[in-house]
Amino acid sequence: MSIGILGKKLGMSQFFDEEGKAVPVTLIEAGPCRITQLKSIDTDGYTAVQLGYGETRQKLVNKPSKGHLARSGEQLLSHLREYRVETIDGLKLGNSITVEDFKAGQKVDVSGDSMGRGFSGYQKRHGFSRGPMTHGSKNHREPGSTGAGTTPGRIYPGKRMAGRYGGKQITTRGLVIVKVDTGHNLLVVKGSVPGKPGSLLNIFPAKGVNSKFANGGK
């Protein structure tokens, strides 16, 4: 049973399948993640598993977090995530979740922070078409009309305009695991995932629209 796992994006590469075709893949260094808390219906009203990832220093962890982490082990961790599960039977505080819980061919969702691009214009942020470049035109990269004048006399909320682009948490769904390397704690996932190399990723079994067909189901 794969609960979920935290990891770090290493970068993209290519993988050759059995037919010799090159498949674009992302390398993710996932886990090991320590079970830091088990939640049950009796104590919390629902069942869940909390995992910790990423060793850190004493000065970077506050006193309440140190007490919380001390229940499951000595090493301090910098990232905590919670995963809902149907049952916590067989799970124990301090145990590790590794890539061995995943298998090739399994579909997963990958969540992370997208690459921040700062304040960006209409073309870069929303893919607007540019204006004419010649014949006296002066509106090469301007947006054009943003609405009528007298009525409504304002710009509607949600209008696509220039602004901060990227740096938000997004989820890429239905990615297929091509290979699991237990020796190096690697998940090789087909396609791209959010974030830049070195950023934190949350990997969990596929949910949502494709959940019916995820993980080999019919």
Swiss-Prot record:
Keywords: Organellar chromatophore, Plastid, Ribonucleoprotein, Ribosomal protein, RNA-binding, rRNA-binding
GO cellular component terms, A-Z: cytosolic large ribosomal subunit; organellar chromatophore; plastid
Intracellular or extracellular location(s): Plastid, Organellar chromatophore
A Pfam cross-reference name: Ribosomal_L3
GO MF term set: rRNA binding; structural constituent of ribosome
Annotated InterPro entries: Ribosomal_uL3, Ribosomal_uL3_bac/org-type, Ribosomal_uL3_CS, Transl_B-barrel_sf
Region annotation (Disordered) ranges: 127-161
GO annotation terms (biological process): translation
Major location category of this protein: plastid
Reported function: One of the primary rRNA binding proteins, it binds directly near the 3'-end of the 23S rRNA, where it nucleates assembly of the 50S subunit.
Sequence similarity: Belongs to the universal ribosomal protein uL3 family.
PANTHER family in alphabetical order: 50S RIBOSOMAL PROTEIN L3, LARGE RIBOSOMAL SUBUNIT PROTEIN UL3C
UniProt subunit comment: Part of the 50S ribosomal subunit.
Name of the featured protein: Large ribosomal subunit protein uL3c
Organism annotation: Paulinella chromatophora
Gene: rpl3
